[in-house]
Each structure stands twice: as structure tokens, then as C-alpha cells.
């Protein structure tokens, strides 16, 4: 599914959180305004250094977050999760909306 990087009602940029799975089954977490573009950059080796030379990459998860400041806080929080917790997020076992709501309340 391709997400549009802009809300239809506003000219405000919408941010997304994404997780990429590497060939060795690690999960990389990032944020962007355009998930397909950013994923192509990672695949071409022009994204994060952490993903260069890691073999085939798969987009494991992406979700609309909203504002940049919230996306940054969410990215930090997800990076602190254990591998098991990230896998549960990817599998949909942990409600992303719950995590997002907790951050909005902070």
C-alpha cells in the first residue's frame, strides 16, 4: 500500500514510522514523509549507513504518525523496544494506536 505524504485537507506534511527487515532478520526503525521513496533509497544503498551491505531489505511495517515532533518521539520509543516487542508490533499483536496514544498524552 502506498501512502500519500500529505493530508488531503491540509498542506501539512504527514510523517510515517517504518521498520525495515534486513537479510539477517534485524529490524531497522526510521521516519519519513514518503515511505516508498525512502525505502527505494535504502535499497539503493543511499539511506542509513546501518542498512548498507545488509542484503535484501523488506519493508516490514509502516504507519502514519502525523507531526514531525511526534514521529521523532515515536521513533525513539520504538528503537528502545526489544526485538520481541518490535516483532509483535510488526505482526499487529501490539496495538500501534495504543503506543501512539501514550506518546500523545506525554
UniProtKB/Swiss-Prot annotation:
Pfam families per record: GIY-YIG
Disulfide bonds: none
GIY-YIG domain location: 13-88
Family (UniProt): Belongs to the UPF0213 family.
Protein name: UPF0213 protein KPN78578_35340
Organism of provenance: Klebsiella pneumoniae subsp. pneumoniae (strain ATCC 700721 / MGH 78578)
Taxon lineage: Bacteria, Pseudomonadati, Pseudomonadota, Gammaproteobacteria, Enterobacterales
Amino acid at each position: 500500500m502506498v501512502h500519500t505524504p500529505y493530508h488531503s485537507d491540509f498542506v501539512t506534511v504527514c510523517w510515517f514510522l517504518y521498520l525495515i527487515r534486513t537479510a539477517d532478520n534485524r529490524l531497522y526503525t526510521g521516519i519519513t514523509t514518503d515511505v516508498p521513496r525512502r525505502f527505494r533509497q535504502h535499497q539503493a544503498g543511499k539511506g542509513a549507513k546501518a542498512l548498507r551491505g545488509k542484503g535484501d531489505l523488506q519493508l516490514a511495517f509502516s504507519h502514519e504518525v502525523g507531526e514531525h515532533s511526534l514521529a521523532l518521539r515515536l521513533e525513539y520509543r520504538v528503537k528502545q523496544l526489544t526485538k520481541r516487542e518490535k516483532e509483535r508490533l510488526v505482526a499487529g499483536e501490539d496495538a500501534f494506536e495504543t503506543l501512539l496514544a501514550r506518546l500523545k498524552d506525554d
